Design a protein with these regions (language model features):
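Short glycine-rich phosphate-binding loop at a beta-alpha junction
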Residues: 63-73, 153-154
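Short acidic, glycine/proline-enriched helix-loop-strand junctions
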Residues: 61-62, 77-94, 165-180
Length: 191
């Protein structure tokens, strides 16, 4: 199964780490005994393919035309899903967009790169959900450009109430591929 293979890839690539003594400082500012490094997973073709495959099967019944998120982390995730979707069904052209952390200070000064049109429906993506901050920033930027954002996909949901609550307040339904608990409960990691 692709899900089990992806979980194993996290362990084989050492993209899931545990350090109960010192922990890890997360992008949210929180400290956690667990660290999930999706950049490593998305840097390998096989595991990137597994992510895209799982995402495609989760998303194919939804109605949206765009996939995007914050630079840099969302780029391989959005393009991988978009490419997989097109190969699986050439009628499905999920275009991608990238939300810059800051608008460019030259050229057109864009905050969002990609071909977007007000009224289109967009899916926002991120690697890991803790507080939901990155998904929310991407959704706010997309909505400011007239896009409709109703769903957010993450590779790993850390299953913290704050993230789900923050997304719910923004009317964004969470679609996780994996949970932290699934990574923790799978050999060789079981402690």
């Amino acid at each position: 199964m692709p899900k089990n293979a992806l979980i194993q890839a996290f362990h084989q690539l050492e993209a899931f780490k545990w350090n109960p003594q010192e922990g890890f400082r997360l992008a949210s500012g929180k400290n956690s005994p667990y660290y999930v490094d999706c950049r490593i997973v998305l840097a390998h073709p096989h595991s990137r393919h597994l992510v895209a495959q799982l995402a495609y099967h989760l998303l194919k019944s939804l109605d949206f035309t765009l996939i995007g998120g914050l630079e840099i982390g969302a780029i391989p995730l959005a393009t991988g899903i978009s490419d997989y979707g097109y190969r699986a069904d050439p009628q499905r052209e999920w275009r991608t967009f990238v939300v810059r952390k800051q608008p460019k200070d030259h050229g057109l000064g864009k905050l969002i790169e990609g071909t977007i049109h007000p009224g289109e429906t967009a899916l926002v993506v991120d690697d890991v959900l803790t507080t939901g901050g990155s998904l929310i920033k991407a959704a706010e930027a997309a909505r400011a450009q007239g896009l409709i954002v109703t769903h957010g996909l993450v590779v790993v949901d850390r299953s913290e109430d704050e993230g789900k609550s923050n997304l719910a307040q923004m009317d964004i339904q969470l679609l996780p591929l994996l949970t932290l608990e699934e990574l923790r409960q799978t050999p060789p990691f079981v402690r």
